[in-house]
């Protein structure tokens, strides 16, 4: 049989989806010549072939594509910029999170990215959706020069059917990823050779100076944090979500990177809805993504079997260390970065619910990873406490989640997602307050951090995953509602005195502390003061009840 031949936007003799026609709208829009090969919506085997041509890319012993993201192995939040333009400027929460960049600077960066992409012999284009609910989903197009980036976004977004691709049309949002090429440091507003810029008027994003794939994922998340509340009055959440198999009960886990969202939501006894990004509309909760982006440091089949078994053909391993001959990954090796990751389609998780659209009203878990060791492993929250701790967004920034973060340290991230917020945090907090008031759902503060002592003092340890899972099981079964509770001083949080499968001494931080009473009191008062200082930013817009729900500083 003769090999297939190239016809317009069909396939070339190698069997790869390509575009060669000068009449193709994409070719015309990018001003490409016919010598440029465009892999348009290429399947994983094709992207593997192209990816293996990239320096340092290979296949793991389990079949995953292993790639390196260059000098940047985490997000660069200090280089994130929003274009200051007339249609969106009045809504933006300007400041350290959303840095302003002028329209002229945007045009220079966009032209720079496109000029770089035009020099490539081969480009990759991915068309996909963000948002599982058809009422709210947006069409996304990624144009990039690395097969690794194309496969990453193919995994992370919602993959259209063949029929949907035929009728895809023009995207609602486009990403130009020219991350191998630096930004112009002499342009107004630039502070480094890295720039991640979003233009809400043009609905486009430009990436320069970083090859870290997570910038694309979080760029789309930022867009949803803007579009959903403004256009649809839908709440966007930095959370994971799962659903009980028998009862159908839905759980939301709020938290920053490294606090346990992905790990805790991947539960064999529950259906996975998503591990990181969700929206909550009047229809219920829906996942924004079509994949999972799991941390891999110290990953094992025993501790996290569903994630471990998802690292197979079609998945991407990012910045991991492996044996040169056998290609077996050493998940305990952090010599490249603490932020080793794996990206895979959500349906690689056997317990995933497809489509990712639960309908029951969820109960909430506000996840924190407390590096001071003074917060309880689990606390039941009042509605006012939910508001206070959601606005505060306290956790410890985990090693490797951002450039330069090498050990855990205390941080406050409004709404547990401050790096991705576009509007003022109180706007999201008010949306959550409305949901709480409407549904009267249960809420818990779950601490996956240190027990017995602070990281700085030593002598403590991170709460074992098996105990955190036992606490969750007790909540889901209703067992934790039957036990007695006691109030922990200063933070005035109610903690259980017992929990099936969990040693009682680790439930109350005052009893678990190993460094003496004076040391504990000093540590908890120090943390309470940090809470109070942080909340001053939002106090003028908070109710008296919410302000009173904070710790006694």
From Swiss-Prot:
Gene3D superfamilies in the cross-refs: 3.90.228.20, Phosphoenolpyruvate Carboxykinase, domain 1, Phosphoenolpyruvate Carboxykinase, domain 2
GO process terms (BP): gluconeogenesis
Source species, domain of life: Eukaryota
Binding positions (ATP): 255-262
GO MF entries: ATP binding; phosphoenolpyruvate carboxykinase (ATP) activity
Family assignment from sequence similarity: Belongs to the phosphoenolpyruvate carboxykinase (ATP) family.
NCBIfam families reported for this sequence: pckA (TIGR00224), PRK09344.1-2 (NF006820), PRK09344.1-3 (NF006821)
Protein name: Phosphoenolpyruvate carboxykinase (ATP)
């Amino acid at each position: 049989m003769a090999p297939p031949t190239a016809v317009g936007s069909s396939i070339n003799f190698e069997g790869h989806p390509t575009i060669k026609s000068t009449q193709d709208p994409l070719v015309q829009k990018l001003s490409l010549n016919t010598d440029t090969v465009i892999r348009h919506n290429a399947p994983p085997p094709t992207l593997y072939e192209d990816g293996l041509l990239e320096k340092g890319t290979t296949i793991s012993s389990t079949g995953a594509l292993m790639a390196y993201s260059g000098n940047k192995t985490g997000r660069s939040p200090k280089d994130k910029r929003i274009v200051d333009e007339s249609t969106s400027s009045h809504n933006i929460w300007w400041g350290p999170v959303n840095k302003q960049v002028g329209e002229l600077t945007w045009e220079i960066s966009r032209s720079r990215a496109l000029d770089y992409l035009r020099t490539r012999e081969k480009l990759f284009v991915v068309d996909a959706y963000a948002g599982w609910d058809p009422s709210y989903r947006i069409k996304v197009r990624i144009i990039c020069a690395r097969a690794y980036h194309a496969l990453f976004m193919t995994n992370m977004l919602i993959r259209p059917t063949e029929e949907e691709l035929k009728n895809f049309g023009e995207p609602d949002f486009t990403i130009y990823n020219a991350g191998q090429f630096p930004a112009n440091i002499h342009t107004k507003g630039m502070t480094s050779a890295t720039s991640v810029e979003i233009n809400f008027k043009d609905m486009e994003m430009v990436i320069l100076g970083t090859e870290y794939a997570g910038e694309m994922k979080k760029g789309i998340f930022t867009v949803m944090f803007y579009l959903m509340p403004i256009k649809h009055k839908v709440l966007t959440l930095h959370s994971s979500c799962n659903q009980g198999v028998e009862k159908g009960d839905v759980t939301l886990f709020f938290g920053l990177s490294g606090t346990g969202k992905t790990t805790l939501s991947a539960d064999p006894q529950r259906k996975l809805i998503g591990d990181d990004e969700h929206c909550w509309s009047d229809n219920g909760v829906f996942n924004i993504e079509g994949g999972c982006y799991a941390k891999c440091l110290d990953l094992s089949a025993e501790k996290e079997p569903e994630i471990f078994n998802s690292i197979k053909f079609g998945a991407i391993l990012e910045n991991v260390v492996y044996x040169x001959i056998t290609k077996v990954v050493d998940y305990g090796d952090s010599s490249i970065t603490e932020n080793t990751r794996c990206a895979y389609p959500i349906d690689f998780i056997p317990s995933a619910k497809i489509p990712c659209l639960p309908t029951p009203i969820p109960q909430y878990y506000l996840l924190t990873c407390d590096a001071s060791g003074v917060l309880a492993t689990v606390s039941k929250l009042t509605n006012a406490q939910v508001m206070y701790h959601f606005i505060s967004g306290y956790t410890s920034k985990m090693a490797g989640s951002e450039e330069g973060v090498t050990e855990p340290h205390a941080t406050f991230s409004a709404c547990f997602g401050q790096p991705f917020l576009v509007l003022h945090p109180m706007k999201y907090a008010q949306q959550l307050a409305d949901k709480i008031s409407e549904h009267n759902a249960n809420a818990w503060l779950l601490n996956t951090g240190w027990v017995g002592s602070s990281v700085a003092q030593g002598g403590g340890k991170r709460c074992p995953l098996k105990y955190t899972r036992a606490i969750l099981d007790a909540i889901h079964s209703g067992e934790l509602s039957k036990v007695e509770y006691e109030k922990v001083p200063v933070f005035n949080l109610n903690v259980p005195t017992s929990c099936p499968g969990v040693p009682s001494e680790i439930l109350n931080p005052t009893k678990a502390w190993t460094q003496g009473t004076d040391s504990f009191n000093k540590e908890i008062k120090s943390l309470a003061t940090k809470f109070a200082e942080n909340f001053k930013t939002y106090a003028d817009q908070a109710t008296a009840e919410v302000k009173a729900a904070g710790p006694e500083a």
